[in-house]
Regions:
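Extracytoplasmic/periplasmic/luminal assembly and interaction segments
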Residues: 49-99
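Short, well-ordered, aromatic-rich surface patches in folded extracellular/luminal domains
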Residues: 2-14, 20-47, 104-167
Length: 167
């Protein structure tokens, strides 16, 4: 058997089956992913101090309620675009939101700190996280939560500005 024939045999018997297996394995993983954007339904985001979560957004209904700088509760309808939802879905995936614990609360309620409830709803599943700003868990987890919260708030502010400019 020549050297060229040996190389071809090696490629055909080891490398090609390995590549086929990789395509099959990762194809099944992507196909069966629990949180796919194609199955996305809505986002619910609430935050405030203690149990009074006065700032709320529900993308299913478009209801947006927040406390402004004068401590007045403002209610309005706010619709996000598909691009906004895709951005938030990808940002949540990048930050590992699907692996966050469901409750990330402070050990004691002595300090007055903001509490956030973030919920992503899909056809087959939902993921909800309750995050307390005074949570003393792993530093990377706290940072990921804070970054996701900032992204959600930024998208809501941009959508509010878009809506005001279009009127």
């Amino acid at each position: 058997m020549s050297s060229k024939a040996k190389k071809i045999f090696l490629v055909m018997s080891i490398i090609v089956p390995f590549l086929l297996y990789c395509v099959y394995y990762y194809g099944m993983m992507v196909k069966n992913a629990p949180y796919k954007f194609s199955e996305f339904k809505s986002i619910q985001f609430e935050y405030g101090y203690g149990d009074s979560l006065l700032n709320k957004y529900d993308s299913r209904t478009g209801d947006y309620q927040f406390v402004n700088t004068r401590d007045s509760v403002i209610k309005m309808k706010l619709k996000l675009t598909k691009d906004d939802f895709l951005y938030l879905h990808r940002k949540a995936a990048d930050l590992g939101f699907w692996d966050f614990p469901a409750k990330e609360l402070a050990p004691t309620r002595k300090t007055r700190s903001p509490r956030y409830v973030i919920q992503f709803n899909y056809q087959r599943k939902s993921k909800s996280v309750i995050f307390d700003e005074a949570y003393d868990g792993h530093e990377k987890l706290v940072d990921a939560n804070q970054r996701l919260i900032k992204e959600l708030q930024k998208v809501l502010e941009e959508a509010e500005a878009r809506q005001k400019n279009s009127k």
